[in-house]
Swiss-Prot record:
Biological role stated in the UniProt entry: One of the primary rRNA binding proteins, it binds directly to 16S rRNA where it nucleates assembly of the head domain of the 30S subunit.
Subcellular location: Plastid, Chloroplast
Gene3D superfamilies (alphabetical): Ribosomal protein S7 domain
Protein name: Small ribosomal subunit protein uS7c
Keyword vocabulary terms for this entry: Chloroplast, Plastid, Ribonucleoprotein, Ribosomal protein, RNA-binding, rRNA-binding
Top-level lineage group: Eukaryota
InterPro entries xref list: Ribosomal_uS7 (IPR000235), Ribosomal_uS7_bac/org-type (IPR005717), Ribosomal_uS7_CS (IPR020606), Ribosomal_uS7_dom (IPR023798), Ribosomal_uS7_dom_sf (IPR036823)
HAMAP family per record: Ribosomal_uS7_B
GO cellular component terms given for this protein: chloroplast; small ribosomal subunit
Length: 155
């Protein structure tokens, strides 16, 4: 048995311009090869793009998009007696938020377009409206969980 205590959860720091933790979480997921300044540049340009297109507060659009994409349940593979079942599991809000950010960025990377800030801004606006590939991913996950509700007792 390990004698180490469980590590404390680290809270996300806020970003330098908007002083928002959610913005920093998105920047840390955009990050590739340690180029944080590039990740900040991509997100800030996307935010500026959203502001010009929608004429709304871009942070509220970001919050709305993440809220719409955040899943309530997910499926986990569970081996029981030689066969694998996809068991539906409820997820906490923090984990749901992380999944939502990951899905939004994955959908915007796959999107056709000029550059990442253009693709990200359009994916965020679509998700805030209730359509887009990230929303489709959430609905697909929920459908999978509803289809496998019979295996919920394997949790």
């Amino acid at each position: 048995m390990s004698r180490r205590s469980t590590a404390e959860k680290k809270t996300a720091k806020s970003d330098p311009i908007y002083h928002n933790r959610l913005v920093n979480m998105v920047v840390n997921r955009i990050l590739k090869n340690g180029k944080k300044s590039l990740a900040y540049r991509i997100l800030y340009r996307a935010i500026k793009n959203i502001q010009q297109k929608t004429e709304k507060n871009p942070l509220s659009v970001l919050r709305q998009a993440i809220r719409r994409v955040t899943p309530n349940v997910t499926v986990k593979a569970r081996r029981v007696g030689g066969s694998t079942y996809r068991v539906p599991v409820e997820i906490r809000s923090t984990q749901g938020k992380v999944l939502a950010i990951r899905w939004l960025l994955g959908a915007s990377r796959k999107r056709p377009g000029r550059n990442m800030d253009f693709k990200l801004s359009h994916e965020l606006m679509d998700a805030a409206r209730g359509n887009g590939n990230a929303i489709r991913k959430k609905e697909e996950t929920h459908r999978m969980a509803x289809a496998n509700x019979a295996f919920a007792h394997f949790r």
